[in-house]
């Protein structure tokens, strides 16, 4: 690769797609990973109606569209829509020709093999990229925090996972995955707001609730105590103005919603909370590296952006770990984008340049080359 041709870094999340150029310190484009199609044919007479809309445009026209997320729980489930999202990323958001740039994509840990093969195939065959690479999201987050050893608790919109990493390599036997993330919390908030008498049901209204969640929710350090405070005073109540001007008030829902991360039983799920999952992940690792993992627990992803989450993690993991263990939870302020930032760092390294899968290698070996070259 000549120096002047920047690689493209695309972090395809279940909720948001983050894209930009390697070497930049933040993504240039961040937009919802959604494809919208008109609910009724021909409603928008004379608007030059398109058969599909992507990202922010789909979001702004959501009233007349059915919105679909092609990535569920971190895994691509609809490849036609995924292709639309990539097309939109390259041509509309970044305004680049993909055949001129190497492309670094990200994927969830423990992704099915067929998934990354398909990604590889689409990049080379549909977009004709000269080179590409698929990196594991959590590993990139760790790089972004300036470490090569640690455990990453990465929680986005569609999936949460704990990934222990030693000297730059993820330890697959100890990776744990939890299908509980931001989208589930949004749905849960919709449900508990309904109990308060507010009604949110459509895909468009779900986006409003997501906004309420992002602006008003927080994690309680002590849930029972916080419930007591909420019951005895109105000090925790906040109001929110809906798009139509109606104002709603929200109280204990503010911390009941993200509490589900620590108590999945709130959602009717029989899994361990994020604190216990992190601990279990550490316990699956060699006894000699556990100390390094406890001292380098890195939070990453948009669902770790709740105020109070780091303190609560510290408290919960301290309760589970041996009493003398030093525990440090690292919550970088830019953790919403740390996967992308790590990708930007990785793709700019001179040592990384021989790691790319080239078009030539792809033509010789086919999509399975991705398992040999990307880890």
Swiss-Prot record:
The modification Methionine (R)-sulfoxide is found at residues 44, 47. The modification N-acetylglutamate is found at residue 2. Widely distributed. Not expressed in skeletal muscle. This is Actin, cytoplasmic 1. The gene is actba. It comes from Takifugu rubripes (Japanese pufferfish). Keywords: Acetylation, ATP-binding, Cytoplasm, Cytoskeleton, Hydrolase, Methylation, Nucleotide-binding, Nucleus, Oxidation. The lineage of its organism: Eukaryota, Metazoa, Chordata, Craniata, Vertebrata. Actin is a highly conserved protein that polymerizes to produce filaments that form cross-linked networks in the cytoplasm of cells. Actin exists in both monomeric (G-actin) and polymeric (F-actin) forms, both forms playing key functions, such as cell motility and contraction. In addition to their role in the cytoplasmic cytoskeleton, G- and F-actin also localize in the nucleus, and regulate gene transcription and motility and repair of damaged DNA. The keyword Nucleus applies.
């Amino acid at each position: 690769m000549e120096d002047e041709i920047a690689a493209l870094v695309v972090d395809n999340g279940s909720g948001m797609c983050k894209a930009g150029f390697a070497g930049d310190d933040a993504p240039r484009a961040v937009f919802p990973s959604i494809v919208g199609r008109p609910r009724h044919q021909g409603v928008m007479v004379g608007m030059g109606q398109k058969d599909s809309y992507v990202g922010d445009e789909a979001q702004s026209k959501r009233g007349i569209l059915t919105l679909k997320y092609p990535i569920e729980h971190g895994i691509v489930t609809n490849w036609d829509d995924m292709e639309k999202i990539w097309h939109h990323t390259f041509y509309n958001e970044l305004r680049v020709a993909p055949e001129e740039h190497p492309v670094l994509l990200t994927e969830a840990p423990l992704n099915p093999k067929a998934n990354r093969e398909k990604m590889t195939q689409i990049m080379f065959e549909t977009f004709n990229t000269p080179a590409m690479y698929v990196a594991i999201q959590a590993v990139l987050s760790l790089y972004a925090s300036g470490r090569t050893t640690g455990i990453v608790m990465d929680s986005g919109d569609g999936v949460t996972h704990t990934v222990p990493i030693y000297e730059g390599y993820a330890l697959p036997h100890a990776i744990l995955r939890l299908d509980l993330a931001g989208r589930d919390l949004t749905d849960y908030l919709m449900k508990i707001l309904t109990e308060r008498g507010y009604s949110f049901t459509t895909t468009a209204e779900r986006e409003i609730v997501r906004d309420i969640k992002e602006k008003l929710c927080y994690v309680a350090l002590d849930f029972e105590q916080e419930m007591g405070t909420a019951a005895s005073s109105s000090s925790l109540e906040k109001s929110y103005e809906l798009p139509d001007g109606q104002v709603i008030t929200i109280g204990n829902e503010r911390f009941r919603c993200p509490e589900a991360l620590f108590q999945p039983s709130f959602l009717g799920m029989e899994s361990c909370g994020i604190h216990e999952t992190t601990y279990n992940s550490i316990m699956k690792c060699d006894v000699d590296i556990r100390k390094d993992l406890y001292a380098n627990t890195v939070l990453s992803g948009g669902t770790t952006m709740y105020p109070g989450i780091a303190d609560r993690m510290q408290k919960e993991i301290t309760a589970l770990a041996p009493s003398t263990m030093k525990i440090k939870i690292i919550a970088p302020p830019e953790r919403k984008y740390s996967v992308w930032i790590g990708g930007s760092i990785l793709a700019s390294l001179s040592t990384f340049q021989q790691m790319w899968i080239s078009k030539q290698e792809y033509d010789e070996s086919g999509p399975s080359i991705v398992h040999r070259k990307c880890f």
